[in-house]
């Protein structure tokens, strides 16, 4: 019977990705699921001049010698950013053109995803472990093709997948957000997307819904309230539900055995909606901490066990 390790919202943290891959052996799991928003959000330029590199991280400008730049690049990747060595002239090009910035980020980001797929191919070879990735609303569409080419990682988006007698459906799309991200749409369209998969599930008692967005008003979707200028209200202490009504409706109607979510980093938890166990393991990728859920499944007993872990 499958033992699932589920993590989400790694946002480019290579430390978290390595921990994710190592979790199969550490926790004796045979299925790894990365639930969305796997890519980083920014490039950190390392400007090469006079035998050293200058860079800015966390508002601090620092210098490093050519001999130490590799260690700095590893540190940047651990925090979820993409290091990029540039000349002063190249930095000026990036500063002057939004199109150059966008094109450069996309290529560096895709190179980063390829790096992760290569790591997965190396670490999972010969283990029999199945690994699934379902890009989330923050991930650009070109990411999908990189994942499709991987040998040991399977793309989850839009598919029904059999996992030892359990049927998993997956989507990284979300309801609308204030940030106009890559994979978001109206609740109506999201409902159609989910129904297209869920309607094909033969038995909800052995169904897993891997849906990046958590269900509305489930307790797994509480995010700090923001104003019209995208600033935190009341110092971030005011929370409001921002989950998807389409996801909530799908869970209420189909009642799958298990639903896996992410998207809202602060809303870690596990709740039951009818017969469905819904889990959001949360995310602390900035700290290099991998937050996850381990779920043991049995075709007769359903959910044998589950545990929220971090490390």
Regions found by a protein language model. Give the residues of each.
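Active-site environment of divalent metal-dependent phosphoester hydrolases
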Residues: 11-15, 39-43, 129, 133-144, ...
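Binuclear metal-dependent phosphoesterase catalytic core
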Residues: 12, 160-164, 181, 185, ...
């Amino acid at each position: 019977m499958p033992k699932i390790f589920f993590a989400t919202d790694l946002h480019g943290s290579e430390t978290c990705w390595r921990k994710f891959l190592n979790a199969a052996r550490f926790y004796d799991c045979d299925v790894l699921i990365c639930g969305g928003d796997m890519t980083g959000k920014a490039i950190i330029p390392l400007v090469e001049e006079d035998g050293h590199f200058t860079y800015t991280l966390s508002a601090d400008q620092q210098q490093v010698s050519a001999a130490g730049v590799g260690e700095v690049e590893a540190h940047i990747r651990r925090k979820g950013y993409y290091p990029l060595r540039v000349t002063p002239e190249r930095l000026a090009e990036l500063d002057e053109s939004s199109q150059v910035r966008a094109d450069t980020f996309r290529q560096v980001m895709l190179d980063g995803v390829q790096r992760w797929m290569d790591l997965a191919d190396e670490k999972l070879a010969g283990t029999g472990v199945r690994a699934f990735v379902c890009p989330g609303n923050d991930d650009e569409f070109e990411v999908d093709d990189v994942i499709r080419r991987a040998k040991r990682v399977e793309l989850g988006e839009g598919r029904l997948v059999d996992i030892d007698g359990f049927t998993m459906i997956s989507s990284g799309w979300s309801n609308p957000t204030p940030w106009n991200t890559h994979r978001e749409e109206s609740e109506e369209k999201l409902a159609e997307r989910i129904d297209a998969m869920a309607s094909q599930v033969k038995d909800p008692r052995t169904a897993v819904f891997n849906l990046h967005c958590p269900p509305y008003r489930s307790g797994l979707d509480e995010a700090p309230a923001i104003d019209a200028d995208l600033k935190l209200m009341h110092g971030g202490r005011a929370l409001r539900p921002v989950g998807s009504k389409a996801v909530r409706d799908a869970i209420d109607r189909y009642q799958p055995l298990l639903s896996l979510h992410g998207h809202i980093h602060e809303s870690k938890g596990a709740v039951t909606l009818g017969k469905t166990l819904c889990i959001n393991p949360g995310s602390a990728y900035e700290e290099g901490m991998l937050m996850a859920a381990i779920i043991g499944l049995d075709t007769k007993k359903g959910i044998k066990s589950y545990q929220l872990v971090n490390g």
